[in-house]
Amino acid sequence: MEDADVYAISVEVAPRFLDDQSAPEDGRYAFAYTIRIHNQGRVAARLVARHWRITDANGRVEHVDGDGVIGEQPRLRPGEDFHYTSGVMLGTDHGTMQGHYDMVADDGTEFAAPVAPFVLAIPRTLH
């Protein structure tokens, strides 16, 4: 059995612009993102930390690290999902986020669950 089969976490992200919480004239653009974390592996694992790299349209990079997500360190059994929504404020109308979660399996193995880059952007209207 390969480690990839034993320790497999998938992450899906759905970002959205929060117009009512943004103030473009002040350089504040609010975005929410809903995350689905799915344990595709064969052993339960706990999400213990998060690591984000946030880049705005000017190339300014911010690193955000912390314990768990939204105040929790969820344990996912094989086949289980965990969903949460959080947010970020950018100084530009678009940017990207990417990162990973630190996971600890029930057998003590530590591994990373990558979060592929995703785009934060204001929806454009066509005229």
Swiss-Prot record:
GO biological process, one term: error-free translesion synthesis
Residue span, ApaG domain: 3-127
Transmembrane segments: none
NCBIfam families assigned to the protein according to its UniProt record, in alphabetical order: PRK05461.1
PANTHER family: F-BOX ONLY PROTEIN 3, POLYMERASE DELTA-INTERACTING PROTEIN 2
Protein known as: Protein ApaG
Organism per entry: Stenotrophomonas maltophilia (strain K279a)
Gene from which the chain derives: apaG
